[in-house]
């Protein structure tokens, strides 16, 4: 793991969290229980405090950063998709930020909201509970449906279960030279399916 102290502040990682060895955590970063931090994620607590609350996930290639005297927060069961950038913002409880989205300084994403992939949320945006946000700049297009929230929660549960699976079986190895016969396929822990 790549953990760095900065001006006396050392990252705090709950023992039940999983942080991929290629992720980088610097300074004032606090990672809660059951959190998943994916490969190549960068959490730079060298300006402001970064809080990733219980059950949340920060996926591959995400960046978290912020300003002094402010907290950048991913709320409980927050779901941050691959390549997203969070800068000085607050992501509400049980919200989802889609892949490659950017959430700017002072923005607040309401709890149980979904930010569509590739969206840009402007600085100072104030979201409400259970909004579907999309576009550049992002705007609320409607409320999140019960089915969409259920789908989001199943995906978040997959990542919460992945924490234990990674602790139990993930390890560095050498590649095989050819595929073995009867190679098994991985199975999820829920019945979630891709959104169509």
Swiss-Prot record:
Protein task: Overproduction of CaiE stimulates the activity of CaiB and CaiD.
Domain of life: Bacteria
Protein encoded by which gene: caiE
Gene Ontology MF terms: transferase activity
Gene3D superfamilies registered for this protein in UniProt: Hexapeptide repeat proteins
Protein keywords: Repeat, Transferase
Organism: Escherichia coli (strain SMS-3-5 / SECEC)
Keyword match Transferase: yes
Region feature (Disordered): 173-196
Family (UniProt): Belongs to the transferase hexapeptide repeat family.
PANTHER family associated with the record: DYNACTIN SUBUNIT P25 (PTHR13061), GAMMA CARBONIC ANHYDRASE-LIKE 1, MITOCHONDRIAL-RELATED (PTHR13061:SF29)
InterPro entries in the record: CaiE, Hexapep, Transf_Hexapept/Carb_Anhydrase, Trimer_LpxA-like_sf
Pathway: Amine and polyamine metabolism; carnitine metabolism
Pfam family name, one: Hexapep
Protein name: Carnitine operon protein CaiE
Biological process annotations from GO: carnitine metabolic process
HAMAP family the record matches: CaiE (MF_01525)
